[in-house]
Amino acid sequence: MNILIFGPPGSGKSTHSRRIIEKYNLEYIASGDIIRAEINKGNALGREMKKYIEKGDLLPDTVINTLVLSRLRKKRENFIIDGYPRTAEQVLALENFLYDHGIRIKLAIDIFISKEESITRISGRRICRQCGAVYHIKYNPSKVPGKCDICGGEVIQREDDTPEIVSRRYDIYINNMEPIIKFYKGQGVYVQINGHGGIEEVWERIRPLLDYIWNREKKKEEFE
């Protein structure tokens, strides 16, 4: 089962992605994690990428395509890609790669929230510096303040989580999504999920859909 998951800043897509990979044993390919790992290398490319991220801008398509598709080459089935593709050009690059390797996307989940909700959520968001686990000081705090429940790493606020940058990132996301939605609707795999509400509430909107797709794919395998 190969899945794409989208959502504006603060939509909870990374939180729900982690639930999905645990429940269905999928490989997690997160564009944000890949970008941060490259930035942390401190090389020329990483420094240039950091400039885009600090302003809330998207990376050039050629850069993010290379990074994500290089990661995807290591795991070509049973994956979830978080936060990619983000532009029409990225869709084209991804779909060409998938076609060349005989891979199909089974589900494209778009978790939608309003700009106001996005800014509210992001202002309280905290990220584990080591493993990337996501917390929120109000809705989903770590058990020990400043310490990750999963790996014990330091939990921090990201530099690009200010209201001004979040607002810009939200607008860029919405403005770029139309051709992506159109394409995956045409493929019959696009589903928009109402992302407002608590984590469990939103999860219960996602889970039945995933169970259906998972069971359908398992039945197909039995007859192959």
Curated annotation (Swiss-Prot):
Catalyzes the reversible transfer of the terminal phosphate group between ATP and AMP. Plays an important role in cellular energy homeostasis and in adenine nucleotide metabolism. GO terms for cellular component: cytoplasm. Pfam families: ADK, ADK_lid. NCBIfam families: adk (TIGR01351), PRK00279.2-5 (NF001387). Its EC number is 2.7.4.3. It is found in: Cytoplasm. Pathway: Purine metabolism; AMP biosynthesis via salvage pathway; AMP from ADP: step 1/1. Zn(2+) binds at C128, C131, C148, C151. Belongs to the adenylate kinase family. HAMAP family: Adenylate_kinase_Adk. Its main location: cytoplasm. AMP binds at S31, R36, D57, L58, L59, G83, Y84, P85, R86, Q90, R158, R169. One of its GO terms (molecular function) is zinc ion binding. It catalyses: AMP + ATP = 2 ADP. This is Adenylate kinase. It comes from Thermococcus sibiricus (strain DSM 12597 / MM 739).
